[in-house]
Amino acid sequence: MKRKSIRVLSLILVLVLLFAVPVAAQVINYSFYTDMADDADDEQFSANALKEDDLDYAFVRVTDSNITSYDNFTFCVVGQNGDYSSYSQEVQATAQTGVYNIYYNRDVYSGNNYRLRGRTSAYYVHTEGRWEP
């Protein structure tokens, strides 16, 4: 009887593992080149990213940049392509690499698309990395 119970439990465990679907948020790579020059963009946007969780913040990882604390470069979450409304606080990036949690100040919903905006107010800034809404 004990052997049969172990077999049944093992079979159930295998079936659960086979049909379990891992849930991971959509991670989008970004690369921004911003500048205050007349012929340059002072802000740029990532591609649309699908929000797949109910967290109250977005996650941004800067993997390479020329950012310093004097650059006055900010990240913000905005709506999908065509919607330039801000959905989060603006967070100033102050280091060449790092992780930023950007908290939402408006309702956001799982299943909707959002974009990351990078904006400079002072100097030429290049930054790249990945983010998830």
What are the roles of these predicted feature ranges?
Residues 3-25:
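Sec-dependent N-terminal signal peptides of Gram-positive bacterial secreted proteins and lipoproteins
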Residues 26-133:
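Post-signal peptide N-terminal regions of Sec-secreted extracellular proteins
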Residues 1-4, 77:
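Short alpha-helical segments used as structural interaction elements across diverse proteins
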